[in-house]
Amino acid sequence: ANVHSYVRSLASVKGHVLGRHGRRENAQPPHSLRPSLPMAPHLCRMPDGARIGYRVLGGEHAQGPTLVMVNGMSAVMDDWMELAVPLARTRQVVLFDHRGLGASHGTGDEDVTIELMAHDVLRLCQALHLRVVHLLGFSMGGLVAQAILSHPDAQPTPDEAGVVIHGIEVRRVILAATFTKSPRTEFRLDGAAIPDDATRTERAMAQLQYMLAMQYHPAVLGEGRPMQHKMDARMRRGLAARRPLNTMARQAGAIAIYQGRDRLRYVPRHLPIAILHGRYDHMVAYDEAREIERFLPQARRLFPHVDGDREAYGHLWFDYFDVDTAWLPPLVHFLD
């Protein structure tokens, strides 16, 4: 669809994340939530003054391990609420925005690195008094999860089936559509088709349209095709979140300079790790999953419960197939 037609059809879209996040600057674990009605984000102050917006779902399950979901590049926590809410039926789930995106704010002068993002995750877990966590890292978030596992201060648990970093025990990890270093990709930061005379709104919409189109594969997009209605829905709500292009560029730079994969050899070989990666992924080449298997030999593939080709999906994996019937069973089975 033409970007100008999107702008016209979405002209009434107004931001609802900005101005809705909490004003507390120290982390306060929220009361138990009804997962179907996620609350507005709270804020957690980092040591350098950055503020990380977060939500906690499924607080009634806080006695068990907490699932921490780590976003990919340019993504905000609302982008995977369709998956987080069902997962919170059986466990506590923590969602957050990386600094500079959505409800989170950086200091403005920090060097954005994968290691810094990993540090933010650990500090948030400490502030929420979490002790045992599972990690679900999607795309760039998978690289952040690897940086946590291979943190210089990480120590194996006595049974060598987990790691402990600064008092946080990581017991299970899902690496979704991710990579071990700067990946092979069809995505380009300047890939959006933006007319020279485009307005600021049109530029933002064109960038969002391009980014979303990369989440799927061409065969499922277009009038009457299965993923078009999902992409349209994401377009309609897409401008509601803060996604500065300069923050996305800084995240891309962080991916490009990350050199931590050789430290994966120190990850305990009995720590359960699952990989999921669709063969139609245009953001992160399918073969990147084989690199994860090479550096983390204990990693095992996780497949949706569907008939036919179980890897016939693109980058935004949980938009493909039904979450409740296809994705929840294997995810819950692995996490439990």
Each language-model region and where it sits:
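Active-site loop/oxyanion-hole signature of alpha/beta-hydrolase fold enzymes
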Residues: 95, 100-136, 140, 151, ...
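Short beta-strand/loop motif that positions the catalytic acidic residue
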Residues: 275-277
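Flexible "cap/lid" loop of the alpha/beta hydrolase fold
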Residues: 157-203
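Conserved HGGG/HGGXW glycine-rich cap/lid loop of the alpha/beta-hydrolase fold
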Residues: 33, 43-106, 110
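Acidic catalytic loop of the alpha/beta-hydrolase fold
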Residues: 280-284
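Catalytic active-site module of serine/aspartate enzymes centered on a nucleophile-bearing elbow/loop
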Residues: 298-336
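Active-site glycine-rich loops that stabilize anionic/oxyanionic intermediates
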Residues: 72-75, 139, 279
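Conserved alpha/beta-hydrolase catalytic His-Asp/Glu region
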Residues: 184, 205-256, 261-266
